[in-house]
């Protein structure tokens, strides 16, 4: 598996061509912020978008951890041909630290990941592979986890379109060629990107998650727009992580690349959530 901090970010030109073609033909491309295991909320948000067959959805990473149904979120993203994803830092940690043979036990390998939400992800796999009689199928879980991890490990780190860059965390304004920036930067950067005094890409708005609205001093019902503008007066960057796992107004945000519309879904508190 990758997750190697020294590598530069991976792109998928086929995905980029499909998304750009969607926009060129008048279709909607909805970009959704960090889901963090809230499968019911993701499903409700996507249903509210009333997608046509031409429309597409991009998840900005951090599909997993903290919420109760990470296993189901990955299943939704894998199986729906209208959904694409970029890799987030929580998937990177899952790739490095998910120990299927010791699932449910906080081993030394899994300790760091468990601390920041991985425990809920591990439990979601246990829940999905525990029958109504309480029988736990470790064999089936290992097969499913192997497929999920292989799928995650092949995801692009960023998506580049004519007018937008879609990435989990952002870019460094100091590290030169954006296509050669490290995976560590693309999945973890914060302040230096948020505080950039010039656009990191003078032709494209960067749409990102990772950093929550309260971190910008905003309400969760808002989105963050950089005060720095492109030559066409569009914001240089837009942040859409509404912090669906906590705060006073936990919600999930979708941003439409074609129209600029924003749709939000309040987090659905399921019975499962009470168990985690």
Regions found by a protein language model. Give the residues of each.
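Glycine-rich, phosphate-binding/catalytic loops in enzymes
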Residues: 48-49, 73-77, 101-104, 183-185, ...
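Active-site environment of divalent metal-dependent phosphoester hydrolases
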Residues: 36-40, 65-68, 90-95, 173-174, ...
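Residue-level marker for buried hydrophobic side chains located in beta-strands
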Residues: 31, 59, 85-86, 165, ...
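Acidic, His/Gly-enriched loop-helix segments that form or flank divalent-metal centers
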Residues: 123-239, 243-250
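A general structural motif
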Residues: 26, 52-54, 80, 162, ...
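Binuclear metal-dependent phosphoesterase catalytic core
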Residues: 233-276
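Active-site neighborhood of divalent metal-dependent phosphoester bond hydrolases
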Residues: 70-156, 195
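N-terminal active-site segment of His-dependent metallophosphoesterases
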Residues: 2-74
């Amino acid at each position: 598996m990758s997750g190697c901090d020294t590598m530069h970010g991976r792109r998928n030109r086929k995905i980029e061509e499909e998304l750009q073609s969607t926009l060129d033909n008048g279709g909607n491309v909805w970009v959704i912020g960090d889901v963090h295991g809230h499968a019911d909320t993701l499903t409700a948000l996507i249903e509210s978008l009333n997608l046509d067959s031409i429309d597409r959805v991009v998840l900005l990473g951090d599909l997993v951890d903290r919420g109760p149904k990470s296993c189901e979120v990955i299943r939704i993203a894998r199986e729906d041909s209208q959904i694409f994803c970029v890799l987030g830092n929580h998937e990177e940690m899952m790739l490095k630290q998910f120990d299927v043979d010791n699932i449910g036990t906080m081993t030394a390998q899994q300790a760091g990941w468990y601390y920041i939400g991985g425990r809920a992800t591990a439990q979601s796999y246990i829940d999905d592979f525990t029958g109504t009689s309480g029988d736990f199928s470790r064999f089936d879980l290992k097969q499913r986890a192997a497929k999920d991890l292989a799928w995650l490990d092949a995801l692009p780190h960023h998506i580049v379109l004519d007018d937008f860059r879609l990435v989990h965390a952002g870019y460094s304004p100091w590290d030169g060629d954006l296509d050669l920036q490290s995976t560590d930067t693309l999945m973890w950067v914060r302040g230096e990107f948020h505080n950039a005094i010039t656009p990191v890409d003078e032709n494209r708005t960067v749409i990102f998650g990772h950093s929550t609205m309260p971190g910008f001093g905003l309400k969760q019902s808002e989105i963050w727009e950089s005060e720095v503008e492109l030559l066409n007066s569009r914001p240089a960057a837009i942040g859409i992580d509404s912090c669906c796992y906590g705060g006073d107004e936990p919600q999930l945000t979708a941003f439409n690349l074609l129209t600029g519309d924003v749709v939000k879904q309040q987090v659905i508190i399921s019975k499962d959530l009470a168990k985690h």
